[in-house]
Amino acid sequence: MVRGNDMLPNGHFHKKWQFHVKTWFNQPARKQRRRNARAEKAKATFPRPVAGSLKPIVRCQTVKYNTKQRLGRGFTLEELKEAGIPAKFAPTVGIAVDHRRKNRSLETLQANVQRLKTYRASLVIFPRNMKKPKAFEASAADCSAASQAKGELLPLKGTKPALELVKITADMKEGSQYGKLRIERVNARLKGMREKRAADEAAKKDDK
């Protein structure tokens, strides 16, 4: 019942609203269908890994997100060269390749090279001709003992840097630390422009 000065309860429905009600009765069957599809995909891709190609570890773009790491599109040609894997051979053994990405950090380059070497060490390459296996292909015994990699390939593990606790000094409290970082970024960006301007001014003085 209505109490006080409240509005009278009235369902504001459209005509034929029953036809527009969304139900969720197919949820359990959908779950089973997805599970069956995953099993069929794993069976079809055997002996290749279920997760697909191996992806590199990259950093997100821009100052806002570059502290975060994620899996990228593919390994660079430089990373493949350092790991001793030919660029045309890599996609045939489940290694994603991205010829456009460039290495701007030695740390990332070394991490991805190590990632490639770890993957290559655990890789079992089935020979095309079992009677005449090539040097890099596995033997019949290794092929029979091989198992399909389930789940994520070499999952990305978050590592926390070791922090050293120090006492806050008076110099640290002076000014804005963020402001100092911004000034350093500006100085790095304008370094070439300022050097060119100084060189031009010096040349003008010499001409005079």
Curated annotation (Swiss-Prot):
Q: Which GO terms describe its cellular component?
A: cytosolic large ribosomal subunit
| Top-level taxon of origin | Eukaryota
Q: Report if keyword Ribonucleoprotein is assigned.
A: yes
Q: Which GO terms describe its molecular function?
A: RNA binding; structural constituent of ribosome
Report whether Ribonucleoprotein shows up as a keyword of the record: yes
* Short name of one Pfam family: Ribosomal_L13e
UniProt record similarity statement? Belongs to the eukaryotic ribosomal protein eL13 family.
Question: What name does the UniProt record give this protein?
Answer: Large ribosomal subunit protein eL13
